[in-house]
UniProtKB/Swiss-Prot annotation:
Gene: mndA
GO biological process, one term: polysaccharide catabolic process
InterPro entries recorded: Beta-gal/glucu_dom_sf, Beta-mannosidase-like_N2, Beta-mannosidase_GH2, Beta-mannosidase_Ig, Galactose-bd-like_sf, Glyco_hydro_2_Ig-like, Glycoside_hydrolase_SF, Ig-like_fold
Organism: Neosartorya fischeri (strain ATCC 1020 / DSM 3700 / CBS 544.65 / FGSC A1164 / JCM 1740 / NRRL 181 / WB 181) (Aspergillus fischerianus)
Record's signal peptide: 1-21
Name this protein carries in UniProt: Beta-mannosidase A
């Protein structure tokens, strides 16, 4: 058959591994159709895509209206009827022809030339089908048809089947669509408390036709593992040992007789060759060919996370040859040399002697160095993955590094991240704590389910293992810390059964699969855990979890903390004391500008039905489109947080009042996170030796009230600015016990060497005048803070200070210090500013700061000054037309100080008109009635 040019969407792309003579057709692009026999409707289709997106583009459903609705799937026929994609193709004859699908969401039957090819039932797996014989016998134009089933309907059918596993009532968590735990699909597609329940279907990743002649091979997947000689996943690697490179390639095609493998490793920046030659100990197992080599331990330049050194990367090319030295397959991957280790080992005698409390460690070590993990949790950035572009993720990751974050927890259950997202993380130095896609549920453990999961685990572990940004594999989200206690309360007598099922899936199945495919990554069975008692890889349950076998006064594992009782939001005695904080937070509203993207003007008020229905905290718990009762609880929590601590907005204009309320919820959220992050970072020098803070959550999936610090279009909330500030390397922090009046000031550093400097403590009233005798507080305190440590520099009680009026007082803390960033040769200066008020913001005797703002085209900076009083929470806001962030925001500004602030534009144009519409406000504006 002759290949028609118009039918070949794109010949071999640079990212496709191939050999000369191989024919690969990338099926991405237009030319597909989306059909429904039930509706008798056909519209143009695309690949990759999902059904909703093609229907949006075809005008069948309205994207704006549909995105407002809570349950699009209930109101449109999407997901209830089979969706079929067709692609006409006319291909030349080759010895073998394969269909390769990198991702089908989720339940499909596939035909080619009207012949059944196969079926799929896992969104997270790569599938390939041999259609050689079908093509040879095909008498018509070959056509690919992919029939997609409704995931909610199929999940319900599985749940109703006689052999379906059941759990005690009240244990399984339904957000909107039920029964998500029976299927291997993105769990949040069925609804979550921060996003919609669209349950999309479609070919969400690329697909290919692969044709080979003779002994040609197509590379399906590649597992490159870089580790120190002798390294074992759960033990600290010996940094003095040479590097072992293990290259394993999964192929399509006949495995050659006595294959050989060669490798070339080049510096990605300079092109210089680090190593080249034949791999040793080449073995064949199934369709995988594997070989190893050794590299001198000091030869490669190490890869470091952001803030700890350079992100040195290498291009690694692996070639497979037959016994005649003919090249059969070649693949190139970009990688880096690093060790990353999650230390869960028992506290040693040396650590006890240093004042660290007994128990077990729970922290990360990069290239042998313990470090403080600063970051957040990333959720799916869109309800439809085909809309997630490289440019969009680059913008998001720019915000991550600009926010002084070095780690993201890739939450389950979204989806395993695309390779290009790991590539971006490699470049920017962002560690990605990755998880298998199980969350807040108990899962089946029948043979078919476990077999499906095993293939999913092996494929994804091998696929992303070469990325130096990969930091951890965790079994799932909150399974040990939430689900096991829930089932214990629901069925105490059957608890041991469910613990056994948990161990069967996450320890007996997944752990060995991870260890068999990587030596370089640690595995934890659950995101939040008390750690393990011991590891015995030859045992049926190779890791003995600690569970509740803890000792009072000892600390184990990481913490997960949410408390919606706003009366204790700033009482740090309620915060958990542990080794690492992997989740904590509180929700807030997005900005007015973001609401205007999705909501009609008449709905822009706090308790409008549309605003309330887009708030999924708390979720409906089922298929209801009138979730006002549960939503009102979450809306009420935000309201109570504002009313307890901040001036209550009361604008005469309804839209302005709505905007002020949105901003007020962000102030509460940001201050609450700041309070916790300061507390956790201070823990680095406390007995708990706390070495990680990952707040919930980084970004939004749509325009709605959520825990996010970055809104759907990339606009930063107050939270992300405040987190950026408090994640600086050296910070000064006040800790106030508002019950006893005790005030402590600490300096905290995450540098790897001691740092020195001074902190100026200055009391002023809210007009900006200094308070006499500095209220009895020393004006300057010198400090020395140890590596990864904290030190108390000042302690007092508010009752002992000579403050004329607590409501008219603010303490300005200004740090100036010197230290050395990791892997740098010279010291640098560090500055940080914080503040403290002896009453909550709502009780302050605020003065109008009379803010003024100007812009210099020459310096491209805004200048802000207060001419009337102290400006608290000084907030620069920008209009639509560009996306980016200010160099600093939500800061305290004293009268007479001119502060220059630049704007980093990530998208759009900063025009003269745009600049004129940039505004500035403060806490004063929140209480003023226009």
């Amino acid at each position: 058959m002759h290949v028609k040019a118009e039918t070949v969407l794109a010949l071999l792309t640079p990212g496709l591994p191939s050999v000369v003579g191989q024919h690969v057709v990338d099926l991405s692009g237009d030319g597909w159709t989306l059909s429904s026999t039930a509706l008798d409707r056909t519209v143009p289709g695309h690949l990759p895509s999902q059904v909703h997106l093609d229907l949006f583009e075809a005008g069948v459903i309205n994207i704006t209206a549909s995105m407002i609705l809570t349950f699009v799937g209930l109101l449109m026929p999407i997901g209830r009827i089979p969706a079929t994609r067709l692609k006409a193709c006319d291909l030349e004859n080759f010895e073998s022809t394969w269909l390769v699908f990198d991702g089908l969401d989720t339940f499909t039957t596939i035909t080619f030339c009207d012949q059944h090819v196969g079926s799929t039932d896992n969104q997270f797996r790569q599938y390939h089908f041999d259609v050689s014989q079908i093509l040879k016998e095909c008498k018509q134009d070959p056509v690919i048809r992919i029939n997609f089933g409704s995931a909610p309907s199929i999940a319900n059918a599985i749940a109703k089947s006689p052999d379906a596993e059941e759990w005690p009532p009240g244990v399984q968590i339904t957000n909107e669509y039920p029964n998500r735990w029976y299927i291997r699909k993105e769990q949040s597609d069925f609804g979550w408390d921060w996003g919609p329940a669209f349950a999309p279907v479609g070919p969400w990743k690329p697909s290919y036709i692969v044709q080979n002649n003779h002994a040609e091979l197509y590379v399906l997947n590649t597992d490159l593992d870089f580790y120190r000689q002798g390294q074992i996943n759960y033990l600290p690697p010996d940094q003095s040992q040479p590097w072992i490179v293990n290259a394993s390639i999964d192929i399509l095609g006949p495995v050659p007789w006595k294959p050989s493998m060669s490798i070339e490793i080049k510096d990605a920046a300079t092109g210089s060759v680090l190593s080249s030659g034949l791999l040793q100990n080449v073995t064949v197992s199934g369709n995988s060919i594997t070989g190893t080599t050794t590299i001198d331990g000091d030869a490669p330049k190490l890869w470091w996370p952001s803030g700890m050194g350079e992100q040195n990367l290498y291009n690694v090319t692996v070639t497979v040859q037959n016994d005649k030295k003919k090249s059969l397959a070649k693949v190139t991957k970009r990688t880096g040399f690093r060790t990353i280790f999650l230390n869960q080992r028992n506290i040693t005698d040396d650590q006890l002697a240093q004042g660290i409390a007994p128990g077990a460690n729970w922290h990360f070590e990069i290239n042998g160095h313990a470090f403080y993990a600063k970051g957040s949790n990333i959720i799916p950035p869109d309800a439809f993955w085909p809309r997630v572009t490289q440019a969009r993720m680059a913008r998001l990751f720019d915000a991550v590094t600009a926010g002084n974050q070095n780690m993201l927890r890739v939450w389950a259950s979204g989806a395993y991240l695309h390779d290009f997202i790991y590539d971006l993380a490699d470049e920017k130095g962002i560690l990605l704590w990755s998880e298998f896609q199980f969350s807040d549920a108990l899962y089946p453990v029948n043979d078919a389910f476990l077999e499906n999961v095993a293939a999913e685990v092996v494929y994804n572990v091998r696929r992303v293992n070469h990325h130096p940004s990969l930091a951890l594999w965790a079994g799932g989200n909150e399974i040990e810390s939430l689900m096991l206690p829930m089932v214990k309360r629901a069925d105490p007598t059957g608890y041991s059964k469910y613990v056994g099922e948990y161990e069967k899936l996450y320890i007996s199945l997944i752990l060995p699969l991870v260890y068999e495919n990587t030596r370089s990554i640690t595995y934890s069975p659950s995101s939040t855990t008390e750690g393990y008692l011991y590891v015995n890889l030859s045992a049926p349950v190779p890791m003995a979890e600690r569970y509740s076998n803890t000792t009072p006064g000892s600390y184990y594992g990481d913490t997960d903390y949410y408390n919606y009782d706003t009366s204790v939001s700033f009482d740090y005695n309620h915060y958990p004391v542990g080794r690492f904080a992997n989740e904590f937070g509180f929700h807030s509203m997005p900005s007015l500008q973001t609401w205007q993207q999705a909501v009609d003007p008449e709905d822009l008020h706090f308790n409008s039905s549309v605003v309330m229905l887009r708030n999924h905290h708390y979720t409906a718990g089922g298929l209801f489109t009138d979730n006002f009762k549960n939503s009102s609880k979450g809306m009420g929590e935000m309201t109570m947080g504002v009313e307890a601590y901040y001036p209550i907005p009361s604008k005469s204009d309804s839209v302005a009042n709505f905007s002020a309320w949105c901003h007020a919820t962000q102030l509460f959220q940001a201050d609450m996170y700041k309070s916790q992050i300061q507390f956790y970072r201070r823990g680095s020098g406390m007995p708990e030796r706390q070495l990680g803070s990952l707040y919930w959550q980084l970004e939004d999936i749509w325009q709605a009230p959520t825990w996010a610090g970055i809104e759907y279009d990339g606009r930063w909330k107050v939270l992300h600015y405040v987190a950026r500030d408090i994640y600086q390397p050296i910070i000064v922090s006040p800790f106030w016990n508002y019950t006893t009046g005790r005030l402590e000031v600490y300096v905290t550093s995450d540098l790897w060497e001691p740092a020195q400097g001074t902190v100026n403590l200055t009391w002023v009233d809210l007009s900006g005048k200094t308070i006499a005798n500095n209220a009895g507080t020393p004006e300057t305190v010198n400090f020395t803070v140890g590596a990864l440590n904290t030190t108390n520099i000042y302690t007092t009680n508010i009752s002992e200070l000579s403050l004329p009026d607590l409501k008219d007082s603010i303490l300005i803390l200004s740090l100036s210090g010197e230290g050395r960033l990791p892997n740098t040769s010279s010291k640098k200066a560090f500055v940080h500013q914080n503040h403290f008020t002896p009453v909550f913001p709502k009780d302050l005797s605020l003065k109008d700061p009379k803010l003024e703002i100007s812009y210099s085209p020459e310096s491209r900076k805004f200048t802000v000054q207060a001419t009337g009083g102290v400006s608290l929470y000084t907030w620069l806001d920008y209009p639509a037309g560009a996306v980016g962030y200010f160099e600093e925001n939500a800061f305290v500004l004293l009268p007479g100080v001119q502060k220059e602030v630049s704007f980093a534009a990530q998208e759009g144009n900063v025009t003269d008109d745009w600049v004129r519409r940039v505004t500035v406000q403060s806490l004063w504006d929140q209480k003023v009635r226009d």
